[in-house]
Structure formats: structure tokens, C-alpha cells
């Protein structure tokens, strides 16, 4: 993944009386003169006097007449959609192939941090042929397929409006001069002129996205001909800031991805967490980025690339990352009983995968936070829950709580469990399948996060 391009803003000023070159010259000449003319004791006293006077000269550079230190503008991740294969088969079936042809596709992304510029990351990581996007625009979303037309902004790639990605490639756009508000929605509109297969996507959008005939990327209200809930080709948005926010990348499965949350409401737990932390001045600026994939597992592909294989790209590759919050493992447990032989995963394998991710994060200077796996007793999915699976979950959570190498534990199990039946989700937080939280459950997860972990 392309690293963020840092751009300098502002200039460091020096007081006219504090020329550093003049100071160096004074010290050099003073030392030369004293070395030639003074005995050792007097030389020491004279050197001390020069050091003290030099300190006084340096100190004047910090006075009220000098300019403030320069600030550096850099890009930080504010939205992500971890890539998957649209055509990936699951449970014996595969979706019908999808493509766009002479159509505009408008996708709505709910960002966390704001900034004064934005750039778009496109991906053809899973495609097997070149991908051409003929035109791209970005604007504030005002609901549904509508945009604030006054904010409609072109997105270019090396100054060109059209971009072609080779199979397996990703590309980062030029910075677009759009001011982005925190915890708001942006609309990214693409035009594809020719038949364009949809392969690289983020499948679980929980967001209505739109398509229309022809090139209408700047339409204030898209004349919609179809809707969908996946994110095609777009895997990230970064914003430029002159401060340095904490960037928390949440990593996990459907519970991170927001399965069952209200469509178009942005009630995934990372959304709730972003809004909650934004209201806490003691924490400072924050960006909460979602790298969940519904159905994801540590040890096996389907659905999506396995967690062990995608952690570095989808988490550590995010611009400006400072923290990761890991919640993954329930599907390794549940699918052990639901799938054919060869899918069995032990508690020891799950804890080893967690430890490996923690070690990778810490080696990059990223704080590794790990969440306990949430209850799933009585889930409606055939073969998913078992007493043996529950024993694995308990063992993994014990490992997490007792692991001293983890920078912080977030106890999502405690936040969601039914006190009368600790292996099950509390009824008020249960989506109804006894595995996934509802909107209130996702809010409870965000409220369980201790902001002090970021400080």
C-alpha cells in the first residue's frame, strides 16, 4: 500500500538577533582564540562563559517575536473497505456475476476523521484483467443518491481523469481539495464506459449504493436505475490533517463489519466508537477505521482472505495507524463444526494467530488492543454452536485477559453477555440469531471501550 505523502505547511521563523550561522561562527572563533592564548584553567572558564552566552542567544529564538514551529500536513486513513472476491463461492453456491457498462456508480462512505483534502484508494487486487475507471468525483452526501453539488470535486490520478489498474494493482489518487467533516458521509461517483466486471469489492456494506445509466457523475441526485450494498473497487479514503490523530484500525469479522445493523444508519460498532471518542476532548483527534470482513476467520479463506494473510495489508497498511483493535476467532470456532473435515481449528491455533498479529503490530510501533470473543450460545446457524466450541471460546478469552504482551484488553464479552446465562448474548443486545448484536449491542460495545487505552 502506498505510504502517505507528507507535505510541509508553514515556515519556521528565526529572530533577526538569533542567526544560527552567526552563533556557530562566534563559537568557532572564540574556541580557536582561546585554544591559542589561554592556559587550561582560564580556557575552561572562558568556554563555560561562551556556552552560557550561547544558551542565552538560543533562548531568544523562542521568544514572543519568533514564528511558531512548522507543522507538517500528512494523510491519515478515515474509511476502509477490506477487499474480497465478489465471485467467491460459499456454502456450495456462488453469486451471479456482476458488471457495469456505460454506467455511473455512486457509493456512500461514512468517514471518521475530517481533513482539508481527501484521496481515494482504488483496488483491482482480485481482478484478473485490467480495470478502467473513466471518471471519478467526490462530494458530500446529503442522503440517498443525492450530493451537495457545491462540494462536487474531481478526483484525478497523476493529473488524469481516467485511470487503468492492471490485474492485482492498487492506486492512490491525487489529493482532492475537498474539506471533509468528521463523522460524515461522502459520495464517490465513478463512470465506467465499457463492460467492467465487478470482482474486487467489500461485500457487506450495510449501505445503499447506486447506479445510473451514462456519465452522470456530477448529478445532484443520481437518476438511479439500481441499488446494491457492496463497495466496488474502493478500498480506502485518506484525509489530510496538520495535527496527528490517533488512527485505530478495527479488525475482525461480521461483528466488526456491522452485520445486522440498520442499513444507511452507520451503526456498526466502529461508527459508534468514532462518534463517542470524538466527543472526548481528553483523547484528542481520532480516526476509527473498519477493517472487518463478514464471515472472516484467522486460519481459512472464505469468506474473504483469512485473517492471518490480510492483517498486514488491511490493518498495518492503513495511513497513519497508531492502534489496532482485534476481534476475530468466533468463526474459526463455529465453522469448525459447521463445515466439512479440514476446517477444524483449535483454541491453541486461534491464540497463536492472535499473538502473531499482536507481535506484528508492536514490531511496527502500533499499539495492539485485543477484544474478548462475544457469546454465541443457542445461535440459529446449524452446527455452529457446541459445548466444545464454547470451551474454545472460554480458553481464547482467558488467554486474551492474561496476555501481558497485549497493550490493552477490551471486554466485549462482558459488555454483551446475559448475566443469567453468560454463554449467551443479553436479549436487549441480540439481533435475533443469538450470534450478532443489534444496534443497541453495537453501541454497548463502543461504550465498553476505555478511552484511557489510547493515552
Tell where the protein language model's regions lie, with residue ranges.
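Alpha-helical scaffolding within the catalytic cores
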Residues: 232, 270-277, 303-319, 352-356
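Catalytic His-Asp segment of secreted/periplasmic serine-dependent ester chemistry enzymes
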Residues: 297, 334, 373-455
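Beta-propeller domains
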Residues: 255-301, 323-325
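N-terminal secretory targeting modules
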Residues: 23-30, 36, 60-251, 256-257, ...
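Oxyanion-hole/transition-state-stabilizing segment in secreted/luminal serine hydrolases
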Residues: 261, 293-349
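Structural recognition of the beta-strand scaffold that forms the well-ordered cores
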Residues: 119, 247-252, 256, 286-292, ...
Amino acid at each position: 500500500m502506498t505510504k502517505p505523502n507528507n507535505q510541509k505547511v508553514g515556515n519556521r521563523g528565526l529572530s533577526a538577533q538569533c542567526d544560527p550561522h552567526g552563533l556557530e561562527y562566534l563559537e568557532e572563533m572564540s574556541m580557536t582564540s582561546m585554544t591559542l592564548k589561554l592556559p587550561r584553567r582560564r580556557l575552561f572558564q572562558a568556554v563555560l562563559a561562551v556556552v552560557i552566552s550561547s544558551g542565552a542567544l538560543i533562548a531568544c529564538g523562542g521568544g514572543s517575536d519568533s514564528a511558531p514551529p512548522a507543522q507538517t500536513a500528512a494523510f491519515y486513513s478515515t474509511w476502509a473497505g477490506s477487499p474480497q472476491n465478489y465471485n467467491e463461492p460459499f456454502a456450495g453456491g456462488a453469486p451471479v456475476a456482476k458488471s457495469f457498462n456505460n454506467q455511473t456508480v455512486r457509493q456512500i462512505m461514512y468517514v471518521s476523521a475530517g481533513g482539508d483534502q481527501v484521496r481515494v484508494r482504488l483496488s483491482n487486487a482480485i481482478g484478473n484483467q485490467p480495470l478502467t475507471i473513466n471518471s471519478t468525483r467526490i462530494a458530500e452526501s446529503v442522503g440517498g443518491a443525492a450530493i451537495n453539488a457545491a462540494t462536487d470535486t474531481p478526483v484525478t490520478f497523476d493529473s488524469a481523469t481516467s485511470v487503468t489498474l492492471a490485474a492485482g494493482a492498487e492506486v492512490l489518487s491525487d489529493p482532492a481539495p475537498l474539506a471533509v467533516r468528521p463523522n460524515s458521509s461522502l459520495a464517490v461517483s465513478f463512470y465506467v464506459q465499457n463492460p467492467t466486471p465487478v470482482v474486487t469489492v467489500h461485500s457487506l456494506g450495510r449501505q445503499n449504493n447506486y447506479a445510473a445509466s451514462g456519465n452522470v457523475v456530477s448529478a445532484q441526485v443520481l437518476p438511479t436505475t439500481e441499488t446494491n450494498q457492496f463497495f466496488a473497487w474502493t478500498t480506502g479514503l485518506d484525509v489530510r490533517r496538520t495535527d496527528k490523530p490517533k488512527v485505530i484500525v478495527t479488525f475482525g469479522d461480521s461483528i466488526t463489519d456491522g452485520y445486522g445493523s440498520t442499513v444507511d444508519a452507520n451503526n456498526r460498532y466502529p461508527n459508534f466508537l468514532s462518534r463517542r471518542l470524538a466527543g472526548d476532548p481528553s483523547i484528542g483527534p481520532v480516526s476509527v477505521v473498519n477493517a472487518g470482513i463478514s464471515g472472516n476467520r484467522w486460519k481459512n479463506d472464505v469468506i474473504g482472505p483469512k485473517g492471518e494473510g490480510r492483517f498486514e495489508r488491511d490493518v498495518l497498511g492503513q495511513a497513519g495507524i497508531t492502534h489496532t483493535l482485534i476481534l476475530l476467532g468466533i468463526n474459526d470456532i463455529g465453522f469448525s463444526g459447521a463445515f466439512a473435515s479440514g476446517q477444524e481449528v483449535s483454541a491453541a491455533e486461534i491464540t497463536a494467530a492472535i499473538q502473531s498479529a499482536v507481535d506484528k503490530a508492536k514490531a511496527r510501533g502500533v499499539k495492539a488492543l485485543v477484544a474478548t470473543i462475544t457469546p454465541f450460545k443457542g445461535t440459529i446457524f446449524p452446527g455452529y454452536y457446541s459445548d466444545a466450541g464454547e470451551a474454545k471460546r472460554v480458553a481464547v478469552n482467558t488467554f486474551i485477559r492474561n496476555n501481558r504482551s497485549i497493550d490493552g484488553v477490551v471486554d466485549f464479552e462482558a459488555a454483551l453477555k446475559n448475566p443469567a446465562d453468560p454463554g449467551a448474548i443479553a436479549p436487549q443486545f441480540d439481533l435475533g440469531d443469538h450470534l450478532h448484536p443489534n444496534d443497541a449491542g453495537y453501541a454497548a460495545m463502543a461504550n465498553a471501550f476505555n478511552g484511557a487505552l489510547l493515552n
